[in-house]
Amino acid sequence: MELILGSQSSARANLLKEHGIEFEQKALYFDEESLKTTDPREFVYLACKGKLEKAKELLANNRTIVVADSVVSVGNRMQRKAKNRQEAFEFLKRQNGHEIEVLTCSALISPALEWLDLSVFRARLKAFDPSEMEKYLESGLWQESAGCVRLEDFHKPYIKSLSENLSVGLGLNVEGLLGVLKLGAKLSSL
């Protein structure tokens, strides 16, 4: 079985590597701007479904394709990827000292199986150090992440408490995916 990660996300690729999952990474283009909803859960679900439909075009020769999408919600206000430094600053200002939710919709499609999961990761944050926030904004690393949230580096020292499903916060429900891959292997051996 050949696994394709339909995402350019380095965080998602790293999650698969950390779990010993071999894959090929391919970008799938889906126009998220076509989605008009401002509800974070609906948005991430529709974006993932759109990517899943694009993935079906690649589905052949015993391939399994994984796609995902994430958004951040602060007080039920959606934060996608910041368009510029000012928007990134506004996102971080809203997160500062508050609870954030990372909503991740993960999906898999194979000749034998289709799976879709919407999960939420929560973290309560301490106040950001203003000079560290400025360095982060200057670095440009925020450009890669929904809501400018990078749990693996910038946000890490500011986490007061978090839910257990860190992989969801990093952009892919790996625990769920591992279970589905095992199920897929059993189904294909029947």
From Swiss-Prot:
The keyword Transmembrane helix does not apply. GO terms for biological process: nucleotide metabolic process. Its main location: cytoplasm. Pfam families: Maf (PF02545). SUPFAM superfamilies: ITPase-like. InterPro entries: ITPase-like_fam, Maf-like. One of its GO terms (cellular component) is cytoplasm. Its cofactor is a divalent metal cation. The keyword Cytoplasm applies. GO terms for molecular function: nucleoside triphosphate diphosphatase activity. Keywords: Cytoplasm, Hydrolase, Nucleotide metabolism. Its EC number is 3.6.1.9. The active site is at residue 69. Nucleoside triphosphate pyrophosphatase. May have a dual role in cell division arrest and in preventing the incorporation of modified nucleotides into cellular nucleic acids. This is Nucleoside triphosphate pyrophosphatase.
